[in-house]
Amino acid sequence: MSRENVELVRNLSEHFVATGEPAWDMLHEHVEVRDHDIMDGREYRGHADVRRWLFEDWASAWSAYSAEPEEFIDVDDERVISVSRVKATGRSSGAEMERQDAIVYVVRDRQIVRVDYYNSKQQALEAVGLSE
């Protein structure tokens, strides 16, 4: 099953890069998202809340943004880490940023039920009990 989960996450990532939209059918209707890069650390639940996180809360900081998937790590039967090279320009500052971000996905019954966004591969690995 874990190989199928890696492919699901890869397809989700490719869809987002190509369209700028999540593949909503791959996200459970009650998906939970936690962005560990946002100060308030609030949890987002469901498609409408995920849309707000992506296109309002998170995106409001950037005037330009791109992410290119670099690696997919099969953690266990439910979890996959996606590592991406992120480039962004600050909306207020104009400062350019490039870093490697990582997302821990939890997959059940061929749908993503939880997303944890980290601003480094190391943070994501530590969150699942691994290290480089």
Model-derived regions, located:
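A short hydrophobic beta-strand element
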Residues: 76-86
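A solvent-exposed, acidic/Ser-Thr-rich amphipathic alpha-helical stretch
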Residues: 22-78
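Short acidic-aromatic low-complexity motifs
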Residues: 1-30, 60, 131
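Hydrophobic/aromatic beta-strand elements that line small-molecule binding cavities or substrate pockets
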Residues: 50, 67-73, 86-87, 100-106, ...
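A short, polar/proline- and glycine-enriched secondary-structure boundary/capping micro-motif
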Residues: 44, 92-95, 123-129
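Short beta-strand edge/turn micro-motifs at domain boundaries
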Residues: 102-126
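Intrinsically disordered, low-complexity linkers and terminal regions
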Residues: 33, 79, 97-104, 127, ...
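Short, cysteine-centered beta-strand-loop-beta hairpins and adjacent loop/turn segments enriched
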Residues: 60-63, 88-98
